[in-house]
Regions:
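Acidic/polar low-complexity segments and flexible, solvent-exposed patches
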Residues: 1-75
Length: 75
């Protein structure tokens, strides 16, 4: 799995999820339930991951949507 985005913006997480769902790219959102522990302060970022084989396509979809500035460095 490769990390695409790390953000505290839950609306952005939802939008990216919708873009990836629309392209039939399976993704995983990590740390989305950590707000229960942190008290909903938004301190801990949510991370969006995709399978290695979907990484290039997912990055292109986000870039096409104008979200390239949100992408994590591709390692």
């Amino acid at each position: 799995m490769r990390e695409l985005v790390r953000t505290n913006d839950i609306v952005l997480v939802s939008a990216i999820g919708a873009l990836l769902d629309g392209a039939n790219i399976h993704h995983l959102v990590l740390d989305q339930n950590m707000s229960i522990i942190e008290g909903s302060l938004g301190i801990l970022p949510r991370r969006i991951l995709v399978h290695d084989e979907d990484n290039t396509e997912a990055r292109q979809i986000l870039a096409d949507a104008g979200l390239s500035h949100e992408l994590r460095p591709d390692e």
